């Protein structure tokens, strides 16, 4: 999964990566050459007192060092550029895929997990690319090249390499093997703590209202402790790795000095050669350390790549047909034909063979008890959900055959829980239509009964709005959402219980003002208060997912027992008579 992801997303940066590999190879070759130069200066210059040779070779050695530094800096810069660009592309692709998800896919992953996958997980893969680009050539060439150079210059000491390298490889392998299963556990724990944190921030009012602060603190503490334990275990193993490497290195160097010193005394090895051998030994062990570091990063990045690929491989249940149309023969009409809807992995039908037609420019209200399917109808009309069977038609076109952008342009939806984005009043209203003028915004605010409080806010239309609209009241937030839908001037307006946060007088004024402002616009209203929809051209009554009544207020009082029961419970027996 990791290789497939990298192969796909690094292809545009092949040129950069080739340059990185060439520069890294040059840098390593220079690094391997430096100990030999140093040995020659000692053996042929210092030992013989030839200062001219020392100056000449010293200057050459300085030039090689400068070239090594330039290659290293350039390789690191290009590697970082390739890795950051790949990370940007990957985040964009994940975001584009998630943006097309329906409520079903988002619920399946969880919002917190999707955020983690597009931030932390991408960062881990990005870091692997950067480290691999700088170490992929360096580690093996340095280790193998160091062995060749060391054996060539001091064959009598090469047995020390044969002892130290296997010991180091076994030790590193044992530690890394213990770390692998911990990485997936850590990512799962990270998802869990992000989910808890997000729920607590989103539901802070509910938590306080039910005095659940202590319980939620304990819940977060448990999640925090879980991730801390896994992280602590990873840290313990990681911390153990480097002292172990240094121990092997130090013991080996002591051995080199001990046995090499005897060989120098016997005249078998020159002093410069012994120093070069120690330098090569350090390079060999550093190559192994870099390789071991990569073996630590690769499993964690592999887990992250798998989680990212899982998102990218998930196909949205709501997709656009290749032959999608953007024309609607009868603008403003809304129709359902024998629509049934069942949530995935559920047995009960939320809607069962529901059929109705809404004529252009008319007002249709939808009423029913809790869990009768009212909001599901709204989501199906806006194609936020896909019908299990039957047809949903907007403007005479099946929503499954319509281009999503063109479909959504036909309607303005005011959800049950309106959401405002961080910005200003104007920027939120212009989400519906960017080219709307200030006069049009004020006109929509006046109809939505929001002009008074917006004009009193500092800045008016430019007054700041916090994320989620948390700096305005629930009723104000709902009125701004209604104004936003009005600014759009769609063929169809859908209100999903959008007046519930308004008091009776404000509700009445808004409906009175909305009448002339929405002439010719089809309105579908999910309502709880029967008194507010008695003038509707058509009222649909849902009960347990079935359409049990359809008609005007007067007709339903005479023909629909469920509607009479609703009216009686809200307005009294006299109103239902």
Feature map (PLM): residue ranges:
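Pre-NBD coupling/linker segments of ABC/ABC-like ATPases
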Residues: 316-329
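ABC-type nucleotide-binding domain
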Residues: 327-577
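Juxtamembrane helix-loop junctions of ABC transporter transmembrane domains
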Residues: 22-23, 27-43, 47, 55, ...
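Transmembrane helices of ABC transporter permease
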Residues: 12, 16-29, 131-186, 258-269
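Helix-loop-helix
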Residues: 49-53, 149-166, 172, 176, ...
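Membrane-integrated ABC transporters
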Residues: 1-34, 46-61, 75-79, 83, ...
């Amino acid at each position: 999964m990791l290789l497939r992801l990298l192969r796909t997303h690094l292809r545009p940066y092949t040129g950069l990566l080739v340059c990185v590999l060439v520069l890294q190879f040059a840098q390593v070759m220079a690094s391997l050459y430096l100990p030999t130069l140093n040995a020659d200066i000692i053996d042929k210059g210092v030992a013989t007192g030839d200062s001219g040779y020392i100056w000449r070779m010293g200057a050459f050695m300085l030039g090689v060092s400068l070239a090594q530094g330039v290659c290293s800096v350039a390789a690191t810069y290009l590697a970082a550029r390739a890795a950051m660009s790949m990370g940007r592309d990957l985040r964009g692709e994940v975001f584009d895929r998630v943006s097309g998800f329906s409520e079903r896919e988002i619920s399946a992953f969880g919002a917190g997990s999707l955020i983690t996958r597009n931030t932390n997980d991408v960062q881990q893969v990005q870091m692997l690319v950067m480290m691999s680009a700088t170490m992929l050539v360096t580690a093996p060439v340095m280790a193998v090249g160091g062995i060749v150079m060391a054996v060539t210059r001091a064959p009598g000491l090469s047995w020390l390499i044969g002892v130290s390298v296997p010991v180091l490889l076994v030790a590193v392998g044992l530690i890394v093997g213990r770390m692998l299963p911990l990485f997936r556990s850590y990512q799962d724990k990270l998802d869990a703590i992000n989910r808890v944190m997000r729920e607590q921030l989103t539901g802070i009012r509910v938590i306080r209202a039910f005095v659940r602060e202590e319980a939620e603190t304990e819940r977060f503490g448990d999640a925090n402790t879980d991730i801390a334990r896994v992280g602590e275990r990873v840290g313990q193993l990681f911390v153990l790795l480097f002292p172990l490497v240094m121990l092997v290195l130090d013991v080996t160097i002591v051995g080199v000095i001990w046995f090499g010193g005897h060989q120098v005394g016997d005249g078998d090895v020159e002093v410069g050669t012994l120093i070069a051998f120690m330098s090569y030994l350090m390079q060999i062990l550093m190559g192994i350390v870099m390789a071991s570091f990569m073996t630590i990063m690769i499993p964690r990045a592999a887990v992250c790549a798998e989680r990212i690929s899982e998102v990218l491989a998930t196909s949205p249940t709501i997709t656009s047909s290749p032959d999608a149309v953007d024309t609607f023969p009868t603008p403003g009409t809304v129709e359902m034909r024998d629509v049934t809807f069942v949530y995935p992995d559920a047995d009960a039908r939320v809607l069962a063979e529901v059929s109705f037609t809404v004529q252009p420019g008319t007002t249709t209200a939808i009423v029913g008890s809790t869990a009768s399917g009212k909001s599901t109808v709204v989501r199906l009309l806006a194609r936020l959900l896909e019908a299990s069977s039957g047809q949903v038609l907007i403007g005479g076109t099946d929503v499954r055959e319509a281009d999503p952008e063109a479909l959504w342009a036909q309607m303005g939806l005011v959800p049950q829980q309106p959401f405002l984005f961080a910005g200003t009043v104007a920027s939120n209203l212009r989400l519906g239509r960017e080219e709307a003028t200030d006069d049009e915004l004020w006109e929509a605010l006046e109809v939505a009964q929001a002009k008074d409080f917006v004009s009193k806010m500092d800045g008016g239309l430019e007054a700041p709005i916090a994320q989620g609209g948390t700096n305005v009241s629930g009723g104000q937030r709902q009125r701004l959402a209604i104004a936003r839908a009005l600014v759009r001037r769609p063929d169809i307006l859908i209100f999903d219980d959008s007046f519930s946060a308004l008091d009776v007088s404000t509700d009445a004024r808004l409906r009175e003002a909305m009448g002339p402002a929405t002439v010719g616009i089809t309105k579908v209203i999910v309502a709880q208060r029967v008194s507010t929809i008695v003038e509707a051209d058509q009222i649909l009554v849902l009960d347990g997912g079935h359409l049990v009544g359809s008609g005007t207020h007067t007709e339903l009082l005479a023909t629909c027992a469920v509607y009479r029961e609703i009216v009686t419970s809200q307005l009294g027996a006299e109103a239902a008579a």
